[in-house]
Amino acid sequence: MRLVSLRNATIRHSGTPALENVDFHIDRGEIVTILGPNGSGKSTLLRSIIGALPLSSGTVERAQDLRIGYVPQKLHIDPTLPLTVERFLSLPVRISKTETENALAEAGVPGLRKRQMTGLSGGQMQRVLLARALLSKPDLLILDEATQGLDQPGSAAFYQKIASVRSQIGCAVLMVSHELHVVMAASDRVICLNGHVCCEGAPAQVASAPEYQALFGSGTHGALALYRHEHDHSHDCDHDHAKDEHEHA
């Protein structure tokens, strides 16, 4: 089932295109990662997907009654503000103790209900933000650099939990990430963005694409190529590199 689809999406800021002629889609159960340098339009694309930013031209279609959960990069909370995890999860609509406990357990942090938000570690904070996103029972879970500031083991544990959540509730997951090694292990499909879609496809295919290497350098290819995708996904670069490899084999 297709959850969100953008066609020829263009967004301009003061006349300058931030995104130009972008085609995008995500289906139920998929894990899709968007990669791109700073200023490439990743956050702009996310905002257009959730409906927070209108398109200058093009079309966007969302499944009827689509529920979206969103985990931001970070959340600033005034350190002088007394705010428990339970109260945070109840804003702006109060939820029951059982709902709070279930959401925290689903996110892998049971027992934090009475903790102060300002006393949480980085990893605990991200799990609480995940719990909040899961309260709506989302069809689509969006993670915007959600592991920024976590160490590698913390990031790996967080993404393992995301994979578990996807399996449990059957949602699609859309990630923006700079952690290339995690992308390869976690994604069904990778989209390389730089104001437009440079290339798209299964992770191993994108890693070998010249468009990808022009943005991230060929030195990343060795680490990324450790991943071997088990399924045959389409590859939608300006040039079909998978076809070239077959013809020259």
Curated annotation (Swiss-Prot):
Q: PROSITE patterns this protein is in? A: ABC_TRANSPORTER_1 (PS00211), ABC_TRANSPORTER_2 (PS50893), ZNUC (PS51298)
Catalytic activity as recorded in UniProt: Zn(2+)(out) + ATP(in) + H2O(in) = Zn(2+)(in) + ADP(in) + phosphate(in) + H(+)(in)
* Superkingdom: Bacteria
Q: Which GO terms describe its biological process?
A: response to zinc ion
The question of whether Magnesium is a record keyword is answered with no
Keyword Heme present in the record's keywords: the answer is: no
Q: What SUPFAM superfamilies has UniProt attached to this entry?
A: P-loop containing nucleoside triphosphate hydrolases
* Gene Ontology molecular function terms on file: ABC-type zinc transporter activity; ATP binding; ATP hydrolysis activity
What membrane topology does the UniProt entry give? Answer: Peripheral membrane protein
EC class, as a word, reads translocase
What keywords appear on the UniProt entry?
ATP-binding, Cell inner membrane, Cell membrane, Ion transport, Membrane, Nucleotide-binding, Plasmid, Translocase, Transport, Zinc, Zinc transport
* Binding site residues for ATP: G36, P37, N38, G39, S40, G41, K42, S43
Q: What is its EC number?
A: 7.2.2.20
Do you know which PANTHER family this protein is assigned to?
A: METAL TRANSPORT SYSTEM ATP-BINDING PROTEIN TM_0124-RELATED, ZINC IMPORT ATP-BINDING PROTEIN ZNUC
Family stated for the protein in its record = Belongs to the ABC transporter superfamily. Zinc importer (TC 3.A.1.15.5) family.
Subunit-structure text: The complex is composed of two ATP-binding proteins (ZnuC), two transmembrane proteins (ZnuB) and a solute-binding protein (ZnuA).
Name of the protein described by the UniProt record: Zinc import ATP-binding protein ZnuC
**Which gene name belongs to this protein?**
znuC
